[in-house]
A protein has these predicted regions:
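Generic structural motif
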Residues: 4, 50-53, 111
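Structured core elements
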Residues: 6-8, 61, 119
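Surface beta-strand/loop "capping" patches
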Residues: 25, 32, 36-80
Length: 164
């Protein structure tokens, strides 16, 4: 669709109220979007959005796109990020192998940021073979991952690209 743009309000939501009390940040982000896309102003209006996940050795590299120079995490650990691995689940009645996917734990404090890439150190270690990463994909979430433009990262889900 033309002239349809998305903003992130994930950092101002409330668990039990669909109408967030803090409306100013949402209005500000809508205004940024209008300035950029309707009036052609050079403003940073796009929130970080996950575009790819690559396994490199035991690390996972999550690449973001958007109007920012770098990412930042508010706090010591990344919130609302889930990693999933596929594993063997047996065979079906025809003898065909089946797989299942389950969430795996990782150290949310063991990360590094290089520009617009979030690197989860050792997330793919210890027998884990991460197949998918999901961010802010629960019914309610509180994000703490932002772009240097001050906008919160958008929810995303990405399959992991081949291991290098």
């Amino acid at each position: 669709m033309e002239k349809v743009h998305l903003i992130s309000s994930s950092d101002v939501g409330m668990r039990y109220d669909i109408h967030p009390k803090r409306k100013q940040p949402i209005g500000y982000r809508l205004a940024l979007s209008a300035l950029k896309y309707e009036y052609g102003k050079a403003v940073q209006a796009d929130a970080p959005r996950g575009i790819s996940v690559r396994a490199i050795g035991s690390d996972l590299h999550i690449e973001f796109a958007g109007d920012m120079e770098t990412l930042k995490v508010c706090g010591e650990e990344i919130k609302e990020l889930q990693l999933f691995a596929r594993g063997f689940a047996g065979v079906d009645s025809r003898g065909i192998p089946m797989t299942r996917e389950q969430e795996v734990s990782f150290d949310a404090k063991d990360f590094n940021i290089e520009g617009t890439t979030l690197i989860l150190r050792n997330a793919n270690a210890g027998g884990n073979r991460i197949s998918r990463a999901a961010f802010a994909k629960k019914d309610y979430y509180e994000v703490n991952l932002y772009g240097s433009n001050g906008l919160p990262a958008m929810p995303f889900e990405c399959e992991v690209e081949k291991t290098i």
